[in-house]
């Protein structure tokens, strides 16, 4: 197998703007509703009463999620139509003409990526 590729993501700089998601969609010209990359928000906490004022104890952070092109991808193994394959360069490929949209790949993926 050739050199493996990756997508560099610096979470400390992410503001959740989804520019990476839009750029991926634009680059690959995916149809409406298909996002090969998506930005996920994790947030929580609450406001605390401190004396007679409210004090924020909240957090929010974002992460960019996409296929990690695993060496032994379970998504390829669970696909009932063999729409998902591993190319010679190690990337996972989805053959749209075979895919029936069952989402078994997404359910099996430890990253919920496809």
Please name every model-derived segment.
Residues 1-114:
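Non-ligating segments of multi-cofactor redox enzymes
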């Amino acid at each position: 197998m050739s050199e493996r590729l990756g997508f560099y993501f610096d979470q400390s700089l992410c503001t959740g703007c989804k520019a990476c998601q839009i750029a991926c969609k634009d680059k690959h010209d995916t149809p409406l509703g298909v996002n090969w990359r998506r930005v996920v928000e994790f947030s929580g906490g609450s406001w605390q009463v401190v004396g007679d004022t409210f004090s924020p104890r909240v957090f929010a952070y974002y992460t960019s999620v996409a296929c990690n092109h695993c060496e032994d991808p379970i998504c390829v193994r669970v696909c009932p139509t063999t729409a998902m394959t591993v190319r010679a360069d190690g990337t996972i490929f989805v053959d749209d003409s075979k895919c029936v949209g069952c989402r078994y790949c997404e359910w099996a993926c430890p990253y919920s990526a496809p």
